[in-house]
A protein has these predicted regions:
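Phosphate/NTP-binding elements of NTP-utilizing enzymes
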Residues: 1-201
Length: 201
């Protein structure tokens, strides 16, 4: 089916809320860092299947990835996988980056949680009580977090949206299975509209 017309930056400007504790909490505005717009919007351009970003530290890569997750979960539900260098880093990212976004961005809170104010965001217990820090279900899709050194996680199920963070710090091989990005990318082959984002510093 055709993708909804809303781009990632349009979605973020309309819905995303930056949590307290960040440098600029409150409503997201892409205009604060205009260079992020083209990167985000590439994820919803027809015909683009891989977005590669090599950048300086602290330029908003995490927010770009979070906006991609939020936009797809809300408007175009899909199986989404985020890979961090290790499982421990994936757990930390889920607790410190994903959980606050789900808590503070209303449309995502409504998707991922059922009883407002009763969620345990630290352990990310969500819609059905069976979700975990590394696996979150929402209507029509799932967000999976895994480490680059975990072949079982990387090859577990088909995904349409793949986000790989700090690729330069990935394990050289996922067990005996080979390159982690190649292994995860094979999960996308059944989707004509798949897209992968590879980020490194």
């Amino acid at each position: 089916k055709p993708l909804p017309k809303t781009s990632v930056s349009e979605w973020a400007d309309e819905y995303r809320v930056i949590s307290q504790g960040n440098a600029e909490p409150g409503r997201w505005r892409t205009s604060r860092a205009e260079y992020q717009r083209e990167i985000m919007n590439a994820f919803t351009q027809t015909g683009i299947h891989r977005v590669v970003v090599k950048s300086a530290a602290q330029i908003g890569k995490s927010d770009i990835m979070n906006n991609v997750i939020g936009r797809f979960a809300h408007l175009d539900p899909a199986a989404i996988m985020m890979i961090q260098p290790t499982i421990e880093m994936a757990q930390d990212y889920s607790k410190t980056r994903i959980a606050p976004m789900l808590r503070d961005t209303k449309v995502l809170n409504n998707l991922f949680f059922t009883v407002k104010g009763k969620e345990d965001f630290g352990t990310a217990k969500t819609r059905d009580g069976n979700n975990t820090i590394l696996s979150k279900i929402f209507p029509g899709g799932r967000l999976i977090m895994c480490g680059s050194n975990s072949p079982a996680g990387l090859a577990s199920r088909p995904v349409r949206v793949l986000l790989a963070d700090e690729v330069d710090r990935f394990a050289q091989t996922a067990g005996t299975e080979g390159d982690p990005v190649d292994l995860a990318s094979k999960r996308m082959t059944t989707f004509w509209n798949h897209v992968a984002g590879l980020f490194s510093t």
